[in-house]
Amino acid sequence: MDHASSTVELNPISEEDLPFWKELLAQQETREHQPLQERTEEELRQHLKRYTEHNLGHPHHREYKWVVIDAESLERVGEVSFDKLDIGQKIGRIGYSVHPQCWRKGFGTAAVGAMVDKIFNKSDCQRIEAECSIHNSASSRVLEKNGFTREGTKRGYLEIHGVRVDHYSFGLLKEDWEKQR
Protein backbone atom coordinates (compact mmCIF):
# COMPACT_ATOMS: atom_id res chain seq x y z
CA MET A 1 0.00 0.00 0.00
CA ASP A 2 1.41 3.40 -0.92
CA HIS A 3 0.93 5.58 2.13
CA ALA A 4 1.33 9.31 2.05
CA SER A 5 4.49 8.81 4.07
CA SER A 6 6.06 11.79 2.35
CA THR A 7 3.54 13.99 4.19
CA VAL A 8 4.72 12.93 7.65
CA GLU A 9 7.87 11.87 9.43
CA LEU A 10 7.97 9.72 12.54
CA ASN A 11 10.64 10.72 15.03
CA PRO A 12 11.32 8.78 18.23
CA ILE A 13 9.81 10.78 21.08
CA SER A 14 12.39 12.68 23.10
CA GLU A 15 12.76 15.16 25.92
CA GLU A 16 12.32 18.08 23.52
CA ASP A 17 8.86 16.77 22.55
CA LEU A 18 7.50 16.94 26.11
CA PRO A 19 5.86 20.40 25.76
CA PHE A 20 4.01 19.23 22.63
CA TRP A 21 2.99 15.94 24.27
CA LYS A 22 1.70 17.85 27.30
CA GLU A 23 -0.25 20.23 25.04
CA LEU A 24 -1.73 17.30 23.07
CA LEU A 25 -2.99 15.64 26.26
CA ALA A 26 -4.40 18.96 27.50
CA GLN A 27 -6.80 19.16 24.55
CA GLN A 28 -10.32 18.10 25.55
CA GLU A 29 -10.98 16.94 21.98
CA THR A 30 -7.95 14.62 22.12
CA ARG A 31 -9.36 12.96 25.23
CA GLU A 32 -12.96 12.75 24.00
CA HIS A 33 -12.72 9.13 22.79
CA GLN A 34 -9.67 7.94 24.73
CA PRO A 35 -8.91 7.24 28.38
CA LEU A 36 -6.17 9.88 28.38
CA GLN A 37 -5.55 12.43 31.08
CA GLU A 38 -3.56 15.61 31.39
CA ARG A 39 -0.04 15.11 32.72
CA THR A 40 2.69 17.37 34.02
CA GLU A 41 5.97 17.53 32.13
CA GLU A 42 7.62 15.68 35.01
CA GLU A 43 5.06 12.85 34.79
CA LEU A 44 5.64 12.67 31.04
CA ARG A 45 9.42 12.70 31.57
CA GLN A 46 9.06 9.62 33.80
CA HIS A 47 6.76 7.99 31.23
CA LEU A 48 9.29 8.79 28.49
CA LYS A 49 11.83 6.42 30.03
CA ARG A 50 9.79 3.48 28.72
CA TYR A 51 10.38 4.62 25.15
CA THR A 52 14.14 5.18 25.09
CA GLU A 53 15.08 2.19 22.88
CA HIS A 54 13.67 2.47 19.35
CA ASN A 55 15.05 -0.64 17.68
CA LEU A 56 11.87 -2.42 16.55
CA GLY A 57 13.81 -5.63 16.05
CA HIS A 58 14.97 -5.76 19.68
CA PRO A 59 13.70 -9.09 21.04
CA HIS A 60 12.69 -7.83 24.48
CA HIS A 61 11.73 -4.17 24.12
CA ARG A 62 7.95 -3.82 24.05
CA GLU A 63 6.90 -0.15 23.89
CA TYR A 64 7.61 2.48 21.24
CA LYS A 65 6.37 6.03 20.70
CA TRP A 66 7.03 8.49 17.89
CA VAL A 67 6.10 12.12 17.35
CA VAL A 68 4.37 12.77 14.03
CA ILE A 69 5.94 15.65 12.11
CA ASP A 70 4.33 17.44 9.16
CA ALA A 71 7.05 16.96 6.52
CA GLU A 72 6.21 20.28 4.88
CA SER A 73 6.05 22.65 7.88
CA LEU A 74 8.19 20.48 10.22
CA GLU A 75 5.62 21.11 12.97
CA ARG A 76 4.58 18.40 15.40
CA VAL A 77 1.04 17.25 14.61
CA GLY A 78 0.53 14.10 16.71
CA GLU A 79 1.96 10.96 18.24
CA VAL A 80 1.81 7.26 17.49
CA SER A 81 2.67 4.25 19.61
CA PHE A 82 3.30 0.54 19.19
CA ASP A 83 3.24 -2.10 21.90
CA LYS A 84 4.34 -5.68 21.39
CA LEU A 85 1.45 -7.57 23.00
CA ASP A 86 2.73 -11.08 22.46
CA ILE A 87 6.35 -11.38 21.38
CA GLY A 88 6.10 -15.15 20.86
CA GLN A 89 3.06 -14.84 18.60
CA LYS A 90 4.43 -11.65 16.95
CA ILE A 91 1.33 -9.56 17.72
CA GLY A 92 1.38 -5.83 18.42
CA ARG A 93 -1.05 -3.00 19.05
CA ILE A 94 -0.96 0.58 17.80
CA GLY A 95 -2.34 3.82 19.16
CA TYR A 96 -2.37 7.33 17.76
CA SER A 97 -3.49 10.88 18.47
CA VAL A 98 -3.50 13.92 16.22
CA HIS A 99 -3.68 17.46 17.59
CA PRO A 100 -7.24 18.78 17.03
CA GLN A 101 -5.90 21.75 15.02
CA CYS A 102 -4.56 19.20 12.53
CA TRP A 103 -7.69 17.06 12.16
CA ARG A 104 -9.18 16.34 8.72
CA LYS A 105 -5.92 16.99 6.91
CA GLY A 106 -4.84 13.37 6.37
CA PHE A 107 -2.19 13.34 9.11
CA GLY A 108 -3.82 10.47 11.03
CA THR A 109 -4.05 8.27 7.95
CA ALA A 110 -0.50 9.12 6.88
CA ALA A 111 0.91 8.59 10.38
CA VAL A 112 -0.74 5.21 10.87
CA GLY A 113 0.37 4.17 7.37
CA ALA A 114 3.96 5.20 8.04
CA MET A 115 3.91 3.43 11.40
CA VAL A 116 2.50 0.21 9.91
CA ASP A 117 5.17 0.29 7.19
CA LYS A 118 7.87 0.78 9.83
CA ILE A 119 6.55 -2.04 12.03
CA PHE A 120 6.21 -4.61 9.26
CA ASN A 121 9.52 -3.63 7.62
CA LYS A 122 11.68 -3.44 10.75
CA SER A 123 10.26 -6.06 13.10
CA ASP A 124 9.04 -9.63 12.95
CA CYS A 125 5.48 -8.58 13.84
CA GLN A 126 2.90 -10.59 11.88
CA ARG A 127 -0.31 -8.97 13.18
CA ILE A 128 -1.15 -5.44 14.31
CA GLU A 129 -4.27 -4.74 16.35
CA ALA A 130 -6.04 -1.47 17.13
CA GLU A 131 -9.19 -0.43 18.91
CA CYS A 132 -11.28 2.71 18.74
CA SER A 133 -14.49 3.90 20.35
CA ILE A 134 -17.61 3.04 18.37
CA HIS A 135 -18.36 6.78 18.52
CA ASN A 136 -15.08 7.75 16.81
CA SER A 137 -15.88 7.30 13.12
CA ALA A 138 -12.81 9.31 12.04
CA SER A 139 -10.51 6.84 13.79
CA SER A 140 -12.33 3.90 12.21
CA ARG A 141 -11.78 5.48 8.78
CA VAL A 142 -8.06 5.99 9.49
CA LEU A 143 -7.67 2.29 10.23
CA GLU A 144 -9.79 1.11 7.30
CA LYS A 145 -7.88 3.37 4.86
CA ASN A 146 -4.71 1.64 6.03
CA GLY A 147 -6.05 -1.85 5.30
CA PHE A 148 -7.24 -2.82 8.78
CA THR A 149 -10.28 -5.09 9.01
CA ARG A 150 -12.94 -4.44 11.62
CA GLU A 151 -13.11 -7.77 13.43
CA GLY A 152 -15.69 -7.16 16.11
CA THR A 153 -16.88 -5.10 19.04
CA LYS A 154 -15.44 -5.20 22.54
CA ARG A 155 -18.32 -4.34 24.85
CA GLY A 156 -17.50 -2.01 27.72
CA TYR A 157 -13.84 -2.15 26.69
CA LEU A 158 -12.52 1.05 28.28
CA GLU A 159 -13.76 3.52 30.84
CA ILE A 160 -13.79 7.03 29.41
CA HIS A 161 -15.02 9.92 31.56
CA GLY A 162 -16.57 7.49 34.05
CA VAL A 163 -18.52 5.46 31.46
CA ARG A 164 -17.65 2.05 30.00
CA VAL A 165 -17.49 2.49 26.22
CA ASP A 166 -17.74 -0.16 23.50
CA HIS A 167 -14.82 -0.26 21.06
CA TYR A 168 -14.38 -1.69 17.61
CA SER A 169 -11.52 -4.15 17.29
CA PHE A 170 -9.37 -3.97 14.14
CA GLY A 171 -6.60 -6.19 12.84
CA LEU A 172 -4.06 -6.16 10.01
CA LEU A 173 -1.98 -9.17 9.00
CA LYS A 174 1.44 -8.70 7.47
CA GLU A 175 0.48 -10.96 4.56
CA ASP A 176 -2.53 -8.74 3.78
CA TRP A 177 -0.41 -5.59 4.07
CA GLU A 178 2.13 -7.08 1.61
CA LYS A 179 -0.65 -7.78 -0.93
CA GLN A 180 -1.94 -4.18 -0.66
CA ARG A 181 1.44 -2.56 -1.30
Model-derived features with residue positions:
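Conserved GNAT-fold acetyl-CoA-binding loop/helix
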Residues: 29-52
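Sparse recognition of residues in long alpha-helices and their boundaries
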Residues: 37-38, 60, 64, 159
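A short helix-loop-beta-strand connector motif used in the catalytic cores of GNAT acetyltransferases and
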Residues: 52-67
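Secondary-structure boundary/capping residues
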Residues: 30, 39, 57-60, 128
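Acyl-donor (CoA/ACP) binding surface of acyl/acetyltransferases
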Residues: 1-19, 23-32, 65-181
